[in-house]
Amino acid sequence: MTKSQGFQFKQFFIAHDKCAMKVNTDGILLGAIADIRHKRQILDLGTGTGLVAIMLAQRTDENTRISALELEPNAYRQAVENCRNSAFSDRLQVYQGDVLDYHFHQKFDLIVSNPPYFSESLASRSYERDLARAATQSHLDWLLQAKKWLAEQGEISFILPFEAAEKLVEQSRTSGLFCTKICKIITKQGQAAKRMIVSFSAQNVPLEEQELVIYDADNQYTEAFKQLTKAFYLNM
C-alpha cells in the first residue's frame, strides 16, 4: 500500500484512505504516553482510524479490553477494519455514535481522546462532523461526558493544542475533576510548546508536569522521543 492509503507500524497497519483524519503525531503521542498501569477497561473517544486504541492494545496484556467510539461513518468503518486486521482484534471493540449521546453501561479505568478542536480559531481535523458540531460542543462537554464513564480510580487523558488544553484545565476546576498530569509537547528544541496532553482524575493528587521535545536543534529525533515510540515506528 502507498502512504496515502495507510501507515505501517511495527506490529500493525493503519489504513486511512477512507478517513479524513490521517495518522498523525498527535495520535501517536497519546497512544504512547497514556498511563496504562492498572488499566483493564480503556475507552478511546473519537477514535478516527482506531490508531490510539490499537496502540493501547499493543501496550497492554490480554486482560485489558479497549473500546473505541466514533461518529463519522467512514471513519467508523475504517476503525473497524483496522482493529479487525490487527493482532489484538479480540480485545478491541468499535462502536458508532456521538460522544454526548452514547450510553456505556460500564466504567472505564482510562479514557483517552484526540478530539476535534471545536474552535473556529484553530485548524479543524476536517471531519465532516466538525462543521456541524463545533458550535454546540466543546472539549469541556467531552470531559464531563467522560467523567460519567470514569471508574473511581480512573484517569482521562486528552491531547489538545496548547491554548485549548490550558482553557480546559481552567474550565475543569468546577467539574469535580482534578488535573493530575500535564505533558507539554515541544516540536523542536528551543520552541514553545504547541500541544499538551492533559490528564484528569476524581482523585486530588499532586500534579505531575513534564515536557517532551520531538526534534533537537539539528532536526533529529530526540532520544526521549525515540524511546517513547521505538515500539511502534518501523525505523526507530
Curated annotation (Swiss-Prot):
Q: Where in the cell is it found?
A: Cytoplasm
Task: Give the EC number(s) listed in the UniProt record.
Answer: 2.1.1.223
Q: Which Pfam families match?
A: MTS (PF05175)
Name the enzyme group at the top EC level. transferase
Provide the protein name: tRNA1(Val) (adenine(37)-N6)-methyltransferase
Annotated Gene Ontology MF terms?
nucleic acid binding; tRNA (adenine-N6)-methyltransferase activity
BP term (GO), one: methylation
